[in-house]
Amino acid sequence: GLRRTYQSSLLFRDLSARDNLFLAVRGVSRGRFSFLRPGAASTTRAAADELLERVHLTGVADQPVAALAHGQQRQLEIGMALAGAPRLILFDEPAAGLSPAERTDLVQLFEALPAHIGFVLIEHDLEIALRVVERVTVLHNGRLLKEGTPAEIEGDAEVQAIYMGEGHRERHGS
């Protein structure tokens, strides 16, 4: 299946992180009334707890989402997108509003995604995108500017001038 995250978080803010994941797992479970089966709730809870571990949120599992840091909310969204073992996930600007430390955590989550899950990343932070994707399509003013590998894009003078600025060139020697 296909899952997605949103640029603006869509979470149940009054519920706990665990409950949000429980609902995500429940929402992709087979069978309209499968929750009536004996043991279904415990299986769903176990799957939610596994997702909490996967996105490094076990320590805040029972806190309301509203009390979580912005980066933790992004991690929770990724966990919810992973519910039901999708084949493809669309990430819409997952780094928006994250601190440098939260961006590092986000990159680690992307790097830990199972190889069988493909993803499309829409991201304004080109440095993050270049670290986690295999192919890059760069748009400028709604038009295709360049396509290529992260190395090709990072080495492109036009992309650097538009999106990365001189500071990037000085830091990375390109």
For every predicted segment, state its role.
Residues L2-S174:
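Glycine-rich phosphate-binding loops of nucleotide-dependent enzymes
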